[in-house]
Amino acid sequence: MKQLLIFCLLFGSIFHHGDAGCIMRGLCQKHTENAYGPCVTNDTNVEPTAFDKTHPAYEKMVEFCPHLLTGDNKLCCTPSQAEGLTKQIAQARHILGRCPSCFDNFAKLWCEFTCSPNQQDFVSISEMKPIEKKEGFTPEYQPAEAYVNTVEYRLSTDFAEGMFSSCKDVTFGGQPALRVMCTSTPCTLTNWLEFIGTQNLDLNIPIHTKFLLYDPIKTPPSDRSTYMNVNFTGCDKSARVGWPACSTSECNKEEYANLIDLDDGKTSGQTCNVHGIACLNIFVMLAFIGSLAVLLCVGFVFTSYDEDYTNLRQTQSGEESPKRNRIKRTGAWIHNFMENNARDIGMMAGRNPKSHFFIGCAVLIFCLPGMIYHKESTNVVDMWSSPRSRARQEEMVFNANFGRPQRYQQIMLLSHRDFQSSGKLYGPVFHKDIFEELFDILNAIKNISTQDSDGRTITLDDVCYRPMGPGYDCLIMSPTNYFQGNKEHLDMKSNKEETVSEDDDAFDYFSSEATTDEWMNHMAACIDQPMSQKTKSGLSCMGTYGGPSAPNMVFGKNSTNHQAANSIMMTILVTQRTEPEIQKAELWEKEFLKFCKEYREKSPKVIFSFMAERSITDEIENDAKDEIVTVVIALAFLIGYVTFSLGRYFVCENQLWSILVHSRICLGMLSVIINLLSSFCSWGIFSMFGIHPVKNALVVQFFVVTLLGVCRTFMVVKYYAQQRVSMPYMSPDQCPEIVGMVMAGTMPAMFSSSLGCAFSFFIGGFTDLPAIRTFCLYAGLAVLIDVVLHCTIFLALFVWDTQRELNGKPEFFFPYQIKDLLGAYLIGRQRATDTFMTQFFHFQVAPFLMHRMTRIITGIIFIASFITTVILSSKISVGFDQSMAFTEKSYISTHFRYLDKFFDVGPPVFFTVDGELDWHRPDVQNKFCTFPGCSDTSFGNIMNYAVGHTEQTYLSGEMYNWIDNYLEWISRKSPCCKVYVHDPNTFCSTNRNKSALDDKACRTCMDFDYVANSYPKSSIMYHRPSIEVFYRHLRHFLEDTPNSECVFGGRASFKDAISFTSRGRIQASQFMTFHKKLSISNSSDFIKAMDTARMVSRRLERSIDDTAHVFAYSKIFPFYEQYSTIMPILTTQLFITVVGVFGIICVTLGIDVKGAACAVICQVSNYFHIVAFMYIFNIPVNALSATNLVMSSGILIEFSVNVLKGYACSLRQRAKDRAESTVGSIGPIILSGPVVTMAGSTMFLSGAHLQIITVYFFKLFLITIVSSAVHALIILPILLAFGGSRGHGSSETSTNDNDEQHDACVLSPTAESHISNVEEGILNRPSLLDASHILDPLLKAEGGIDKAIDIITIDRSYPSTPSSLPCTSRMPRAHIEPDLRSL
């Protein structure tokens, strides 16, 4: 933690003098307790003197400067100088010691400068100052009258560049070691030398050293002795006998890149190209040409030769048609079986509607009580990730071993001001008043308090995270840490004397004059070196929590440096290891958010942005409540449209109340309630089995199920209305026959479509994505229950309402009744379906669509469109923009925008090793450590490589490797791990026992490792702890806080990084680093980050070659894991859906293979068209869009099955004519019914504030509806016209092709034969209606002849309806039916 201090103390060793070869010698000027200026040896060079071998510093000189101790051991430094030099070189080992060669070169630099007997050859004094007497201190060199203040140190470029080359790739804490020794990024040799030569007494650097570089090639031979040019050691070579060379990861990054190949081929694939053209594009072009050729051939064949029509003519010529094969007979049997049973159900309901009603009520009574167990999941993770998913399983393992990661609370301040024109810190936020406000905010947050359910007060101190232990403050990552949280430090002033030479120094940032901006000088120093213990301003940069504040964590920027920061970030960490801690944290966060919202309204100086861990959940709930009005309006339109569009409205007998006779207001409203009840039943059943939906999924489910139910309601009611046109008058007593006929015509299609819808939904329920799974399961069961309720409760209601209509009674006014029922019927039957939509489809759309050229052109357009959508669909992206879940005005949306724009740090990621390993064994340690002697492809080296290749791995920042720190902490040369001599089992901490750190009271732990001491010193076993010592001191390491004496203490970084078994062994451990900055609005960043992290974890697992499992975990992974597999899962499910739908339609419609194939073609095309439009409108594939694709299956099935059923029931002979009649009769029902209902209610969602609603439930759902309608009403009929099946009743009866009453929605032959047996022989199943059946009751009634003549006359001449007519209609008049015109 104290790298800079440790390194800079090294430079306090640059003091000496001599006469013959020394120009400075001894200590003369005391600046601080650890910084002494060396003595000037006047004008006479002083010869070096022999070093005393008995002095304790001699052994250290042998260790660090052995090249100087040869022969007579004459040096230019005194023993006291050498002692200070070696102590500080030893501390510099913490930073550079990972590469022994680098460290040796660095030691040579300062050994030569301080102690070389040839010092006068390459060191010159530039500035000296008179010695000032200090009490208690006597200069070591008595003749000296001045001390050295500035020197010039001449180096050869060979040594300087060789030293820099050996050190440039050395890492410290996962980052380049030179980064803490150099203010520029990247660090260059010149900048490095200038920085380490800068004078700073507060950092114990007593003199200013100017490095001058000389090129040996360009320097004359006579001058080559004027610069220091000792031999350097390359990083790939051993510096000393017994020392290892630097590891490849610390020496040659280019070579190391060839050793470690992270890509295992599972995260990227090669793109197929032929001469630069994508293979997919080539394929679709060929497919288009082939499809176009097939279409033209088929069009030619079917326009010149109609097999069905020829067979009909042959049959009419007396030729006997071939006997149906077994498949056709089976299909006919299925067809008749379903119609007959449907008719029986309808007739039973017509006779006894109460029984059906009570059966439906029994279903409700069985299902609805389960609602008492109903609850919605409000956990955001549960909404997006399955508990069985890999990320959630790994999260459970991680939490079980290390506890939950801390909760984050964030505040961001942005300045209204512009950049400053001058100054060290010129960013808009570097104003004193802004930092004063920041301190006020922090103090207010610390005073936030709330109470739990027991009345106990909860403050930040009760919930915050303290990495250094109870004796330290909460971890609040903020620039206030640079001032130790003390606002008064902003008023500090500097009055220090000038200590720097007159020459300007680019690295001396601090002014020595008294200034009110001294706080800014101090902050600038902390931004450059955040781990500095003491800046020139006299303050530490360390926070009161015990650690540094990295500039990229506390300052936001959109430039290349933090001096230009335009935002300030404050991050507060809160613990959540246990459920009580989570509850306390959430209570405090609630008050925290309340404070922030209030403060935002009254912060004129800054732009205030914030969020807490619970913010996302809270805002989703709040925004959902705000959108209730929008959803209610949409549902109100849905209910209103269904209620009023089912009926017919015209006045009879000049009575205004008669307008409600043919209305269906109550039936429409109750049908919607039935749909609602079916949803409740689904909820109840699944709740009983413990399957609970995610938040707000039920609203979507109710919406979808209601829309599908509306389709069935319209088909039943409109089918009845159409049949009334072609039926003679039937009395109320014949209601069972009417209902039976309606059920026979609609229930088979209803059953088929419902089964197909439920199947497509249930297939979606097999996914592990909770949002899709729960929606699909609930919707699938609701669809089936809705069918049951339609066949029971709705059917009973339909019977009662039909009886009311047949009796001429208006809704809501039951005492009233139309007297002339027959007169009302004769006009009403004409206006039953002859609306504008019916006429438009019957006379305009259907003939035009079935025209030969129209079909061919439409087919070509369809194929071209399909091919285009395939290409566009291949480019669709996956993901979800988090900001879309909130309104534009939400404080989270604002905060997300600022994070994207200014914040430069990604989320943490933990590489976890799960499994019990023998960590005490050196061979296992070598698989994880990174210093010399460890494997080049060790776990730690791979991690360092991954962190260093950010663009490939999306990893960045420091890598926390506990095994490295522990082995450094317990090593023989480390001052960290010591035990008492009198009690070797008692740990002697550097924090608790400052007076006992000498060898007399405490000695290193390894001195008492008798097992390790039994090995030779050259053996690795000698330098590594034995099993007993390893595990005994591991817990001491985890409790040891880092300090200036020992930077390797593990409490701050590794306290929660290791999980132990009951035997004290390591069960699991984690190695933390960070992702690079990930764009919140670009989910592909998060997806790639997760994929690459897992790629790295797979490589790490191979590196340890053991039974342990390695996985990467981050809090973001459960949210984004779905996107790695959503495309193959969705594709598989849609494929299964298509296959299943084909089978269901084929079987339930009487083995209609051709019709099912046409429906499947439309289904597949519909998928591609929706996905293509998603690409055009920039809507990625995610759980919401996937849900829309599943819904599109249900909607298109509902439409298609009715079209196929109408086509199969048509009595026309040619395929084109059957398709035309289907469009004319089914088209207006579908378009005016479910399509208008869906589209109309969806349009109201466009006014929602939530982008998630406007995009996924307005824009995308509208695309789904329109695409499904186009495929069902245009594409499917055209496909059927090219070659659909003939149905199961078309060959049994030969009729006139032009008889429109025998189109798709007329009675089937079986239905007609059944009704022909009805009492009084009202229907005798003629090909044309017999007028006598209509006129007979009129002729027998009083005045009936006149009325009949009036009606016939009116309908022939098309005049305006006279006032004498019993019924007047508001609807436009249409042509009279053929049977009436024949009168």
UniProtKB/Swiss-Prot annotation:
Major location (coarse):
membrane
**What phenotype has been reported when the gene encoding this protein is knocked out?**
Both ncr-1 single mutant and ncr-1 and ncr-2 double mutants exhibit slow embryonic and larval development, and hyperactive egg-laying behavior (egg-laying constitutive (egl-c) phenotype). Ncr-1 and ncr-2 double mutants inappropriately and transiently form dauer larvae under favorable conditions (dauer-constitutive (daf-c) phenotype).
Membrane topology of the entry: Multi-pass membrane protein
Intracellular or extracellular location(s): Membrane
Residues with glycosylation annotation: N42, N231, N447, N558, N993, N1082
**Protein source organism:** Caenorhabditis elegans
Reactions catalysed: cholesterol(in) = cholesterol(out)
One GO cellular component term of this record is: late endosome
Q: Name one GO biological process term.
A: cholesterol homeostasis
MF GO annotations: cholesterol binding
Q: Which gene encodes it?
A: ncr-1
Q: Which cysteines are joined by disulfide bonds?
A: C22-C76, C28-C39, C65-C111, C77-C115, C99-C246, C102-C167, C182-C187, C235-C251, C464-C474, C526-C541, C929-C934, C976-C1046, C977-C1005, C988-C1002
Upper lineage is:
Eukaryota, Metazoa, Ecdysozoa, Nematoda, Chromadorea
The protein's name in its UniProt record: NPC intracellular cholesterol transporter 1 homolog 1
